[in-house]
């Protein structure tokens, strides 16, 4: 039996020797490689924080002490040592262990994360609650250098520093080299700054100098300047010191002893402390060390070779979007592309290679990305800002106030719209229709397939004013990509087939599910109209009303929440016209959606052929069809 199998709770780590900890770190890395190679997941970030996580759980007392993981994708080690080893093989699977901290999973997951830059704000909140309740415990936020680019992180640092909140921020820096500054001088300065005698003597000397008649005040100022000069020379964390934090580090994030020592030092300080830890992303697995970006978030792979397992499939919507944008940018030098730290994930890496001067990666700063794009538009450019649906939530005010209200010519590409699979509820893009369709002058489209996506992108760049374009994470339908691009009439749906008995309205790829269901309905003697809505705003009210009056029964199908979604929009149209004799069944989500394969999630919520047939049965169009049809 290995050491890992004996670790049931963090307290079991405290009695281990350092050689045993080294062996445990190897076992943890092997377990993570084994599971992630089968399930996919965030491998490189977790390989880089093994020693850091062990040190945190040896020095601090979770769950009494609060450890908050920013983003949360680097919490696998934390899960393994907090009683979840037996469930670890279910990581990111349907009904399995989440890839992010979940309060319902363990008391050691004190705060749920998934989006970046939130941990320091949460830590300030926990610390203030502790102080108000007169409790005694430590609060630690662990944040990566990437997440530190988010403005919210600095808002929280400013608050914590200003209020002198007793808390610890661990900056996990996997971009900076473990170099000479991790040495004697750094260790000496760390000890000096955490020694209470240093603070006392500093004040005493300053007061003594000020008492010297005539020149005392000037001498004190000179000493202060000399101290500041030394800090500029020797202290890498001056920015954090100026914000009110005691800075400790940088520390080798793979040196178990050094990590534990610096955390013990941090516990001595009764004001905000930032511990700067240098780690190697992907450590301990050669393919990941060589290509940490690939293994940041990776699908199933061959753990021996590190090769990602790919099945033959059509290109993804993201790939088609990126290639189409490059094609259009070749002909129009005004087209620019903006992303918030997701060049590969949004398909803009190709644009970045071809047009580096017109490509902008602004970091994890969605708010800035959107407002920056608005000003680019007013400056005469044609910006296309591509952000995942779930992250557009963070920039809603900028979309409304800076883009739409002044009618800026900005194309907002909404990637990962709909459920995204294994990353679960923090990453599903199932709210964008609700919060965007209410904006009066925003043209809002959704393509049924990858070819229509190309035409919609082309159309977007011809329009005057803001445009949003939503498309899913998945592969395309495998349709032919037509070479000549054309404008699609704004606000006009596509009627794919007409039938007198029922109307199926789909948005995005759900249109193909509607078409497949229409075939099954025809086999049962029911003729269905199938509408590809195309435009969520403005709606094709004319077509909706025409077929509502004709069939009297409508089923709407959307990869989105029901509340405020496309189905709600259709019902609003019917209500405005007083069509009380038309019955509508809406298919979509009415709760937070769990993690799992996209197809499995769709089936579970009725976004399938069977789901549509059952909805038709509820509308009394069909006799019972249970068990008589396959998805």
Swiss-Prot record:
Residues that coordinate or bind thiamine diphosphate: 73, 114-116, 146-147, 174, 285, 366
Subunit structure: Homodimer.
Species for this entry: Desulfitobacterium hafniense (strain DSM 10664 / DCB-2)
Catalytic reaction annotation: D-glyceraldehyde 3-phosphate + pyruvate + H(+) = 1-deoxy-D-xylulose 5-phosphate + CO2
Cofactor: binding comment: Binds 1 Mg(2+) ion per subunit.
UniProt-listed InterPro entries: Dxylulose-5-P_synthase, THDP-binding, Transketo_C/PFOR_II, Transketolase-like_Pyr-bd, Transketolase_BS, Transketolase_C, Transketolase_CS
Pathway(s) the chain acts in: Metabolic intermediate biosynthesis; 1-deoxy-D-xylulose 5-phosphate biosynthesis; 1-deoxy-D-xylulose 5-phosphate from D-glyceraldehyde 3-phosphate and pyruvate: step 1/1
Keyword flag Magnesium: yes
GO-annotated molecular function: 1-deoxy-D-xylulose-5-phosphate synthase activity; magnesium ion binding; thiamine pyrophosphate binding
Name the record gives this protein: 1-deoxy-D-xylulose-5-phosphate synthase
GO biological process, one term: thiamine biosynthetic process
Residue ranges that the Swiss-Prot or TrEMBL entry lists as coiled coil: none
SUPFAM superfamilies given in the database record: Thiamin diphosphate-binding fold (THDP-binding), TK C-terminal domain-like
SMART domains the UniProt entry points to: Transket_pyr
């Amino acid at each position: 039996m290995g050491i890992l199998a004996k670790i049931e709770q963090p307290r079991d780590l405290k009695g281990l020797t350092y050689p045993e900890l080294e062996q445990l770190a190897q076992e943890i890395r092997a377990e993570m490689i084994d599971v992630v190679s089968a399930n996919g997941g965030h491998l490189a970030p977790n390989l880089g924080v093994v020693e850091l996580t062990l040190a945190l759980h040896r020095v601090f007392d979770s769950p009494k002490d609060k450890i908050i993981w920013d983003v949360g994708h680097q919490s696998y080690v934390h899960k393994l040592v907090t009683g979840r080893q037996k469930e670890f093989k279910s990581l990111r699977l349907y009904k399995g262990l989440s890839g992010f901290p979940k309060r319902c999973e363990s008391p050691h997951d004190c705060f749920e994360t998934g989006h970046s830059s939130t941990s320091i704000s949460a830590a300030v909140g926990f610390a203030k609650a502790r102080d108000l309740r007169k409790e005694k415990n430590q609060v630690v936020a662990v944040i990566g250098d990437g997440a530190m680019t988010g403005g919210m992180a600095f808002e929280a640092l400013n608050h914590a520093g200003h209020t002198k909140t007793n808390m610890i921020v661990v900056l996990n820096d996997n971009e900076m080299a473990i170099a000479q500054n991790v040495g004697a001088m750094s260790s000496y300065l760390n000890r000096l700054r955490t020694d209470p005698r240093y603070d006392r003597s500093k004040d005493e000397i300053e007061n003594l100098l000020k008492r010297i008649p005539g020149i005392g005040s000037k001498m004190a100022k000179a000493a202060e300047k000399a101290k500041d000069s030394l800090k500029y020379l020797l202290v890498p964390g001056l920015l954090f010191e100026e914000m009110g934090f005691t800075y400790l580090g940088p520390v080798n994030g793979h040196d178990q002893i050094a990590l534990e020592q610096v955390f013990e030092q941090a516990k001595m300080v009764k004001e905000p402390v930032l511990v700067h830890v240098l780690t190697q992303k992907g450590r301990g697995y050669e393919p990941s060390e060589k290509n940490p970006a690939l293994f940041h978030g990776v699908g199933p792979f061959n753990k021996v070779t590190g090769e990602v397992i790919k099945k033959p499939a059509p290109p993804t919507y993201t790939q088609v979007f990126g290639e189409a944008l490059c094609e259009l940018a070749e002909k129009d030098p005004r087209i620019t592309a903006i992303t918030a730290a997701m060049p590969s994930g949004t398909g803009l890496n190709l644009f970045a290679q071809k047009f580096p001067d017109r490509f902008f990666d602004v970091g994890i700063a969605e708010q800035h990305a959107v407002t920056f794009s608005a000003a680019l538009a007013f400056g005469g450019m044609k910006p296309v800002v591509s952000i995942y649906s779930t992250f557009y939530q963070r920039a809603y005010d900028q979309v409304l106030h800076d883009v739409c209200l002044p009618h800026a010519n900005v194309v907002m590409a909404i990637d990962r719209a709909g459920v995204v699979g294994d990353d679960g509820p923090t990453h599903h893009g199932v709210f964008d229709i609700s919060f965007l369709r209410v904006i009066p002058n925003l043209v809002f489209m959704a393509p049924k397939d990858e070819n229509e996506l190309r035409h919609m992108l082309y159309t977007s760049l011809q329009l005057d004013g803001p445009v949003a374009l939503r498309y899913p994470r998945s592969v395309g339908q495998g349709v032919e990509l037509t070479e000549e691009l054309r404008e699609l009439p704004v606000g006009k749906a596509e009627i794919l087939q007409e039938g007198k008995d029922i109307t199926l309205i789909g948005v995005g790829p759900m249109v193909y599910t509607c078409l497949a269901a229409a075939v099954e309905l025809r086999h049962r003697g029911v003729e269905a109209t199938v509408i590809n809505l195309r435009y969520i705003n403005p709606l094709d009210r004319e077509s909706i009303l025409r077929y509502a009056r004709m069939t009297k029964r409508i089923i709407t199908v959307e990869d989105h929440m029901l509340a405020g979604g496309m189905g709600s929009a259709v019902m609003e149209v019917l209500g405005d016209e007083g069509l009380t004799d038309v019955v509508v069944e809406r298919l979509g989500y009415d709760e937070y959606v769990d993690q799992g394969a996209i197809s499995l999630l769709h089936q579970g919520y009725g976004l399938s052929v069977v789901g549509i047939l059952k909805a038709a049965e509820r509308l009394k169009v069909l006799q019972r069809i249970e068990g008589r049809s396959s998805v």
